[in-house]
Each structure stands twice: as C-alpha cells, then as structure tokens.
C-alpha cells in the first residue's frame, strides 16, 4: 500500500470511519495528488474565491450601513466552510442543496462523538454499541442520507465523463471530476463502457466525497475560527493584512489566484502561526507496530499492535524550537528582508507537524491552506470584526485528541465600505 494511502487508512480508523467506509480505497489519495499542480490549484482557487463571496453574502445576510450583527463564530464559520467545501467537491455548475448541506454538516459533527462512544467500551462490546447507541445510529442516519443525495449526481457525472472528448487534456474543475479521472486511470471504473460493478464503484466515489467533506471542512474551519479569534484579540494585524492582500490583488489583475496568495507572505505567516499555536490535533503520524520492535536509543521494546504517535503540540510549544512559544506572533514566519513566509505554510518539517511529515504527509495540505487563507482574508476584507464579550475567553479546549475552538466566543461584524 502507498504510504499516503496507509496514512489515510490510519487516520480513518482513528476517526472510526472504517466502520462505514472502504478506507483501503486509494482513489481519493490519487485524486488529490493529481490536483497538486499549478493549473489545477488555480482552477480550484478561483472556484473557492467565487463560492466564498457567495457564501459570505448568504450566511451573514448582509447587515446594512453601519449596523453591527452578532454571530456565533464557531457555528457561522462551520456553516460557511461546509457550503464552500461542497462547491469544491461538486463544481461550479451544481445547484445548492440545503438538505445535502444539513446532513453533511450533521454527519461531520457526529463523527467524533460516535467514535468516542464506541471506543469507550471493551472491544467485545463495540459491535453492539455501533448498532444500538444513539450516537452511532445518528451518524449512520446522516451518512445514508448524504450518500442518497450524492449517488445520482456521481452517476450522472461518470456518464458525462465517459461521453466527453478524451483527446482533450482537461483539468478537473472539481474534486469529483478528479475522483472520476482517478477511478478511470486505476481501473476502478471503465472510461468507455458501463461495467457490472458500476453501481458499487459509484457508491464508493460518493463515500469518498463524504470523506473529503469531513477532511476539508472541519480542520480548515477550525483554523479559520482560530484566525478570527486571534485577529479579534490582536487587532493590530488587521490593517497590514488587508493592505497586503489588496496589493497582492493588484499584482494579479484583481483575480484571486494561487499567485495572489504567494504575494501575501504576512497572511501566510499569520495562518501558519495559528496552525502552530492552535493546532487542532495533539498527535500526528499514527503508526501501528506490525512485528516486535526495540528502540535501542531509549531501551524500549514494543509489541505488535502498539500505536505510535508524534506529539505535535509538544513540539510546537517547545521553547528550544520556538522563542516564547505560548505567545501568538503573527509574523513569526515572515522574513521581512526577503518578503516571504519561511518556511511556507504547507512545508512540513520535524518542527512543524500540523500536516505530519515525510512520506505520510497530508496530500491535501496545499489545497487546505489555500482554503484557510482565502476564506479568512476575504472575510477580513469584506467585514469589520470585533469580539462581543469584553473579557478574553479561552480560544479552545481539548476534547479527546482534538483541540476544539471555544463555542462560546461571539463576534460582531459589519460590512466595510472598501471591502473587496
């Protein structure tokens, strides 16, 4: 198995997704890798920018004039990211589906509670918990309803891809297009004719979309939420980040492209610092010992079945690695002499483990960081934002292995007259 696919398998098992998905399927990994090129990322980023503008106006219901509107930060950004993610999955020509949006969001919210409930029991009892507990039944309900909405669209798009002119090299305009192309390439689906196994493969692609939605929506939403908490707590960053973004737009003729983001190193540093200090996962690089292993350097023997983890948060808060590590410094990674973010936000290392490191690094990290930066800076350009609460609330709390944004933080917003 490819190492990236193996990582996907481990992560999926950790979130209990192996209970309802074929987590050994390599197609979603191959599809993401096929999009990791400048042309595909630009296509997706333009769609991301357009859909973000649309979602912002719909979700915030556009307060008028100088009126402020109070919103729950967590719920608002989760809804926004769910809407934008679904557009990236299905493409620009798919009509919004409120029912699909509701059940996709509800499914994402149910994943970890279902996992905690099931794994809180001895292994011998877990099948019964999966079948009868209210948390697991709720998750299965939303999963089946999302699948029911997606399968017809996937089948329609597979048929359209088969009928398309195959002599043209057309880049995918959505992640579903990339999934279908990957399935054609690896033989899961025939690119020419309907096969006997089509129904099962179409359902598997629908399941891959559900997996994508969870993986792209939840982590990016949490990072954007933490960026908003940070900007409300440190308003001195607002003007420089807005000014940099507007200058970057001028350099790309007003179009939101991957190049626009490259011209915004302060924004990239701000986003990376948020990942570092408010990383949603305390551990990364899940590994299972397959045969007896001895770590001679520390004299530790490990039995097969032992789970190994890398302590991401401990590394990010290590004072020997980062100066004053518990203090937010939005320009920590900004090199003013070269006007770059160094290292880049999607660059992994032994000292920056948000996306793991090495061969098992998150394959979607480039797209994920584009989502985080684009949605955050578009929000900041279009709206004034300030905290509702006078006291500074904790940014988040630990729930199992996940660092969750504080759901009590409220924000107050109003449109900016010169927003772009």
Curated annotation (Swiss-Prot):
Gene3D superfamilies the UniProt entry points to: Cytochrome P450
A GO BP entry: (+)-kotanin biosynthetic process
Disruption phenotype: Leads to complete loss in kotanin biosynthesis, but accumulates the monomeric intermediate 7-demethylsiderin.
Organism domain of life: Eukaryota
Record lineage: Eukaryota, Fungi, Dikarya, Ascomycota, Pezizomycotina
Protein name in the entry: Bicoumarin synthase ktnC
Molecular function as annotated in GO: heme binding; iron ion binding; monooxygenase activity; oxidoreductase activity, acting on paired donors, with incorporation or reduction of molecular oxygen
Protein family (similarity comment): Belongs to the cytochrome P450 family.
EC number, as in UniProt: 1.14.-.-
PANTHER family the record matches: CYTOCHROME P450
């Amino acid at each position: 198995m490819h190492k990236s696919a193996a990582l996907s398998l481990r992560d999926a098992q950790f979130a209990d997704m192996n209970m309802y998905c074929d987590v050994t399927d390599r197609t979603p990994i191959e599809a993401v890798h096929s999009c990791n090129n400048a042309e595909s990322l630009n296509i997706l980023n333009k769609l991301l920018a357009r859909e973000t503008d649309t979602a912002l106006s719909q979700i915030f219901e556009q307060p008028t004039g100088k009126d402020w509107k109070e919103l729950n930060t967590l719920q608002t950004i989760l809804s926004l990211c769910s809407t934008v993610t679904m557009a990236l999955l299905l493409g620009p020509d798919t009509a919004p589906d409120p029912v699909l949006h509701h059940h996709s969001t509800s499914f994402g919210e149910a994943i970890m509670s279902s996992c905690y409930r099931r794994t809180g029991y001895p292994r011998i009892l877990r099948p019964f918990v999966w079948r009868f507990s209210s948390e697991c039944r709720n998750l299965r309900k939303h999963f089946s309803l999302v699948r029911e909405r997606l399968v017809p669209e996937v089948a329609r798009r597979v048929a359209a891809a088969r009928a398309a002119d195959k002599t043209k090299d057309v880049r995918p305009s959505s992640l579903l297009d990339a999934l279908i192309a990957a399935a054609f390439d690896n033989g899961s689906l025939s690119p020419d004719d309907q096969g006997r196994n089509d129904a099962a493969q179409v359902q598997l692609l629908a399941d891959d979309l559900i997996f994508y939605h969870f993986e792209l929506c939840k982590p990016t939403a949490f990072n954007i939420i933490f960026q908003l908490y940070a900007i409300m707590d440190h308003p001195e960053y607002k003007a420089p980040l807005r000014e940099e973004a507007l200058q970057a737009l001028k350099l790309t003729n007003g179009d939101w492209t991957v190049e626009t983001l490259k011209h915004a190193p302060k924004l990239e540093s701000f986003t990376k610092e948020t990942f570092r200090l408010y990383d949603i996962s305390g551990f990364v690089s899940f590994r299972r010992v397959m045969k007896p292993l001895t770590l001679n350097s520390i004299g530790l023997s490990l039995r097969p079945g032992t789970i190994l983890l890398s302590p991401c948060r401990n590394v990010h808060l290590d004072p020997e690695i980062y100066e004053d590590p518990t203090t937010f410094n939005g320009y920590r990674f900004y090199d003013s002499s070269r006007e770059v973010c160094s290292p880049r936000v999607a660059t992994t290392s032994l000292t920056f483990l948000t996306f793991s490191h090495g061969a098992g690094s998150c394959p979607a990290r480039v797209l994920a960081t584009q989502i985080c930066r684009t949605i955050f800076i578009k929000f900041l350009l279009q709206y004034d934002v300030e905290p509702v609460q006078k006291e500074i609330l904790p940014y988040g709390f630990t729930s199992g292995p996940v660092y969750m944004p504080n759901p009590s933080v409220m924000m107050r917003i109003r449109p900016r007259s010169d927003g772009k």
